[in-house]
From Swiss-Prot:
Belongs to the UPF0266 family. HAMAP family: UPF0266. The lineage of its organism: Bacteria, Pseudomonadati, Pseudomonadota, Gammaproteobacteria, Enterobacterales. It holds the Pfam family DUF986. It is found in: Cell inner membrane. Keywords: Cell inner membrane, Cell membrane, Membrane, Transmembrane, Transmembrane helix. It comes from the Bacteria. This is UPF0266 membrane protein SG1324.
């Protein structure tokens, strides 16, 4: 196994661990029961496309220079993980009893200083040191978030 193969295996394992953590552990095992699950608008599709093109270039170079089949297979597996993470997986915001998960980071409700709704359909949540810009797929979800936060506060 070459250094390249080891690097590819490490990236695949990290991507798999993130996918399992994001899909199952955050939703069911961390911080109690999920009260509301809101799908968010996808961002970073161009980044995923650029990464896939770079992987295709690596695959082409590996095939044309008679590289190992294992390296080509690992590049394809990494490409599949990138496709899943960038295009299939739906980002979401999970509301629990004590706080919410946004971007896989838990934020307590007590940290919320202010909330605003912009004209573009963004929910702006001001925390102590930064603001979160949350864009949902359906505008009805903003009302669900609002009612849940009013109920909790």
């Amino acid at each position: 196994m070459t250094v390249t193969d080891i690097g590819l295996v490490i990236m695949i394992v990290i991507a798999l661990l993130f996918a399992v953590f994001d899909e199952f552990i955050v939703d069911y095992a961390l911080r109690g029961k999920t009260r509301l699950r809101v799908p968010l608008r996808r961002q970073g599709r161009l980044d995923g496309l650029i990464f896939i093109v770079l992987l295709l270039i690596l695959l082409y170079k590996n095939i044309t220079t008679d590289g190992k089949v294992m390296t080509s297979t690992l590049i394809l597996f990494l490409g599949l993980m990138v496709i899943y993470l960038a295009y299939i997986r739906c980002p979401r915001m999970l509301f629990k009893t004590e706080g919410f998960f946004y971007g896989n980071v838990f934020i307590n409700y007590s940290r919320i200083k202010n909330m605003n709704l912009s004209e573009d359909g963004y929910l702006v949540i001001d925390l102590e040191k930064r603001s979160l810009l949350i864009q949902v797929n359906k505008l009805d979800d903003l009302q669900k978030i609002y009612h849940l936060l009013i109920e909790i506060q």
